[in-house]
């Protein structure tokens, strides 16, 4: 009986000590390579995502890998539409262990990105929590008005404010603070239902 209890306790300690490791990187293009990083206790999956920043006719694509939580894996596509004809969209995929070594690169499919008749107040401001709003037309499945205030963004500005249209999936990801692996910054995220232009 004692040996059985000892084995159970040993197994528990070993399980606790086995931390997940994920490759972490962020590079231009459709692939990226980085070093392995031990994930936090609450992070139980690795995630790879391809992101496209669009300001027609130009676009910029980069690929990222990091630790994440499995409760966000179903949020595999996110999109936002901002002022100045700026749009950002991303496709995500989760993996664990050897699966990450054989998983094909994430691919962002081409789509028409059509307007859906909904609108949100939008603005982009650096170095301030406020910015001059203008009406932004939403596209595709964007049905949320996003308001994001970031603090301690040392690599861009101390503070940043972003408002525009967003998908529900993007709101959920931002509210779960999934970007903690990239840097130590604070995000205040609020999302509200979009409104038709006729209501303005």
Swiss-Prot record:
Signal peptide: 1-19
GO terms for MF: phospholipase A2 inhibitor activity
GO annotation, cellular component aspect: extracellular region
Residues carrying covalently attached carbohydrate according to the record: 33
Transcription regulation among keywords: no
Complex formation: Heterodimer of subunit A and subunit B.
Protein's job: Inhibits the enzymatic activity of phospholipase A2 (PA2).
UniProt protein name: Phospholipase A2 inhibitor gamma subunit B
Lineage of the organism: Eukaryota, Metazoa, Chordata, Craniata, Vertebrata
């Amino acid at each position: 009986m004692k040996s059985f209890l000892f084995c159970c306790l040993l197994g528990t300690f070993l399980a606790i000590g086995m931390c997940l490791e994920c490759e972490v990187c962020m590079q231009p293009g459709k692939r990226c390579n980085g070093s392995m990083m031990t994930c936090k206790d609450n992070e139980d999956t690795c995630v790879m995502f391809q992101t496209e920043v669009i300001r027609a006719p130009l676009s910029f694509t980069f690929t990222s890998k990091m630790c994440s939580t499995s409760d966000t894996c179903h949020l595999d596509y996110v999109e936002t539409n901002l002022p100045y004809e700026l749009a950002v969209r991303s496709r995500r995929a989760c993996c664990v262990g050897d699966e990450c070594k054989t998983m094909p690169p994430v691919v962002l499919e081409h789509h028409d990105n059509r307007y859906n008749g909904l609108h949100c107040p939008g603005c982009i401001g650096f170095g301030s929590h406020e910015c001059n709003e203008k009406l932004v037309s939403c596209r595709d499945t964007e049905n949320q008005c996003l308001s994001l205030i970031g603090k301690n963004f040392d690599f861009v500005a101390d503070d940043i404010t972003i408002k525009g249209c967003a998908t529900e999936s993007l709101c959920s990801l931002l509210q779960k603070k999934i970007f903690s692996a990239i840097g130590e910054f604070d995000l205040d995220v609020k999302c509200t239902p979009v409104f038709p232009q006729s209501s303005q």
